[in-house]
Amino acid sequence: MSYYSGYSGGLGYGYGGFGGLGCGCNSIRRLGCGCGSGSYGYGSGFGGFGYGSGFGGYGYGSGYGGYGYGCGRPSCCGGYGFSSFY
């Protein structure tokens, strides 16, 4: 696990980013650990908080900028609540 630039211009740690498995922290707005895109892990994708994957995995958290439980694709962008892999 090495440092990388986060999902979108933030400092973070982990590995992967867009499309591999691997988690890192922080992205744009809030601190939060999570995967970049198409993986699984713990944290938010873009700027929220919670656990889950960023774009197309599975877990507990939000995809883009809110918080919720299991977001998949941008169906949960900027929102919160239950969501699935669409």
From Swiss-Prot:
Tissues of expression: Strong expression in narrowly defined pattern restricted to the lower and middle cortical regions of the hair shaft in both developing and cycling hair. During hair follicle regression (catagen), expression levels decrease until expression is no longer detectable in follicles at resting stage (telogen).
Region annotated 25 X 2 AA repeats of G-[YCGS], chain positions: 6-81
Induction entry: Expression in skin and hair follicle is regulated by HOXC13 and by GATA3.
Gene Ontology CC: intermediate filament
Keywords of the record: Keratin, Repeat
Domain of life: Eukaryota
PANTHER family: KERATIN-ASSOCIATED PROTEIN 19-3-RELATED, KERATIN-ASSOCIATED PROTEIN 19-4-RELATED
Function: In the hair cortex, hair keratin intermediate filaments are embedded in an interfilamentous matrix, consisting of hair keratin-associated proteins (KRTAP), which are essential for the formation of a rigid and resistant hair shaft through their extensive disulfide bond cross-linking with abundant cysteine residues of hair keratins. The matrix proteins include the high-sulfur and high-glycine-tyrosine keratins.
Family named by the database record: Belongs to the KRTAP type 16 family.
Assembly notes: Interacts with hair keratins.
Protein name, per record: Keratin-associated protein 16-3
Organism: Mus musculus (Mouse)
